[in-house]
Amino acid sequence: MAAVVLVGAQWGDEGKGKITDYLAERADVVIRYQGGSNAGHTVMVGHEEFKLHLVPSGILYPGKLCIIGNGVVLDPAVLVEELDGLAARGVDTSGLKISNRAHLILPYHKGLDAAEEEHRGAAMIGTTKRGIGPAYVDKAARTGIRVGDLLDWEEFSAKVAHNLAATNELLAKIYDRPGYDLQAILEEYAGYARRLRPLIADSVRLVNRALQEGRKVLFEGAQGTLLDLDQGTYPFVTSSYPVAGGACIGAGVGPTRIDKVIGVVKAYTTRVGSGPFPTEITGPAGDALRQQGMEFGTTTGRPRRCGWLDTVILRHAAEVNGLTGIALTKLDVLTGLDPLRICTSYRYRGTVGEDFPASLKALEECEPVYEELPGWHEDITGARSLDDLPANCRRYIRRLEELTGVPVHLIAVGPRRDQTIVLESPF
């Protein structure tokens, strides 16, 4: 048995899609355990680019069992579009299964998402307006509608009617927005029910049986540790649990099943939307790094804010996830930047500390304390071993390991599958 959890160790967009793709080739089962279509994973197969939002990255390998787990909130419209797009490009999607316990996103969730964000005004949190938060709210309030409800149309229809009555009243009286038509929703979702029925399964049983049979299981996370509902920069976070503990809840396995936890770390730091960002690089230098790294959101297209590597947040990620290894991505983007800066600690009101603060107000006041390292100018995209990398590049990697206390196992030196240096394979 081998169970590996892959998590983002920063604010998401770390390059998890590429690392998941690499590990999926070696896994038997790939399960997505949280989030929704607000996530976007980009995978390069040769010179062909695939952008996935809900379907696990393992779908690009024939014969893999790919599962959308119970911790996901599923927008069936997005899923059907994604499946059709993959089929049109010759990808076999027959290995996909959807948890009957996963919750559904309905049209009114998206309407609420947009209305609530607009209502926040200057305090907006940067939601993608895809209905993720409101769907998780319904789940926590125990009024959510699950994928398994699509199998009982009478039950599904009654639940939608009940929820819609309350939601339409909320939209009208609080947000001064039009409501949604019940019949239109039922007609739309009847089509999804017919289409998705063969894919709906007891995913908890599937994944636990696979582990009992000694198969290799990869738990694919979305977003990142700093977007976790509890461990992230609250309230500028997502509505689920991207950390390793979320894999147990969102896939339905016990914590003793997990063997390794790999944190995906971008060689610099990025974040999308609002919230404090101590190592952010502003002005032309930040713009140049954004263009060099092609830092624009897979889901939204929004430009990402860019900054230097921050090992304060990485130590926090190492602790809350129990990281056993790091997959370092986009190292090639740093080529030509000299010197390089690594944040080793924060200065807060004159005091230097290495801990990541829970208080958003405190984090906004934190000033990064930097250590400078010499950069490199050699092209590293063809490197396939550690020895192929320039000495200053290896020094940067070693310093990351020293400051986080976590060994680097994988290094991405380009977007393609083959542009990966393997120091230790998780499987």
Curated annotation (Swiss-Prot):
Function, as annotated: Plays an important role in the de novo pathway of purine nucleotide biosynthesis. Catalyzes the first committed step in the biosynthesis of AMP from IMP.
Catalytic activity: IMP + L-aspartate + GTP = N(6)-(1,2-dicarboxyethyl)-AMP + GDP + phosphate + 2 H(+)
Molecular-function GO term, any one: magnesium ion binding
Principal subcellular localization: cytoplasm
Ligand binding (GTP): 12-18, 40-42, 304, 330-332, 412-414
Entries under PANTHER family matching the protein: ADENYLOSUCCINATE SYNTHETASE
Protein name in UniProt: Adenylosuccinate synthetase
UniProt xrefs under HAMAP family: Adenylosucc_synth (MF_00011)
The species this protein was found in: Moorella thermoacetica (strain ATCC 39073 / JCM 9320)
Binding site for IMP: D13, E14, G15, K16, N38, A39, G40, H41, T128, R142, Q223, T238, R302
Listed cofactors: Mg(2+)
Lineage: Bacteria, Bacillati, Bacillota, Clostridia, Moorellales
Subcellular location: Cytoplasm
EC number, UniProt record: 6.3.4.4
Record gene name: purA
